[in-house]
């Protein structure tokens, strides 16, 4: 099993640096060079290590073309994960939808809703909910979705069951920070407490959770087993600086 990052970079030093870092970590990628600057994000951490983001606009990843190399990844994908942020521009949004249209019928399609600043609309969210079979969302995003779609009064579990049924999802993953996490599936509810750890920062914690959960499901683990491992890996990432620390072998066997 291997993963591939799909994006775009600019003809600039930042793009070169991004590829060098990915190469050093032996990560696979398909990132066409386009006539826009490589994307940047300014991250500020509060005293609890929780990040806020200033995400620059009009950058390379807003303009990802659907190339033959990207099509090749789509038609062979066992899983794909995308968010709402990458859909803020029409170009990349169309590429994402075209990618999804080329995936196999049994592909795990994970919509990590990833609400950032004001870079989302009800229409974009609805379209992705229709196209995914797994939703990953956090408790703050769930509140926002409840307000957007007219069910703010429901408690978190009932909101999750409602979304799961309305969009015919296979699974819904809800993370609630220090208050634990849930996985909902038809007839199944899994809850895991969040381990108490010394937090360096939480950048990358959500993505490591999603990636671990996805890989575990693809390997045939049960929802409960995948959930347990995802919680452990996410907690470990919180103890490290940066979004992509080396994961201990005990979690990758």
Annotate each predicted stretch with a short phrase.
Residues 2-84, 102-105, 253:
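Conserved N-terminal subdomain of the carbohydrate kinase-like
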Residues 7-10, 113, 176:
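Short beta-strand/turn micro-motifs composed of small residues
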Residues 54, 145-146, 237:
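Residues that scaffold the ATP/ADP-binding catalytic core of kinase and kinase-like folds
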Residues 69-70, 125, 160, 199:
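Acidic, amphipathic alpha-helical patches
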Residues 72-73, 127-128, 165:
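Structural alpha-helical scaffold elements that stabilize or flank donor/cofactor-binding regions
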Residues 79, 83-158, 180:
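Conserved beta-alpha-beta core of the PfkB/ribokinase-like small-molecule kinase fold
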Residues 149, 153-253:
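Conserved phosphate-binding/catalytic region of the ribokinase-like
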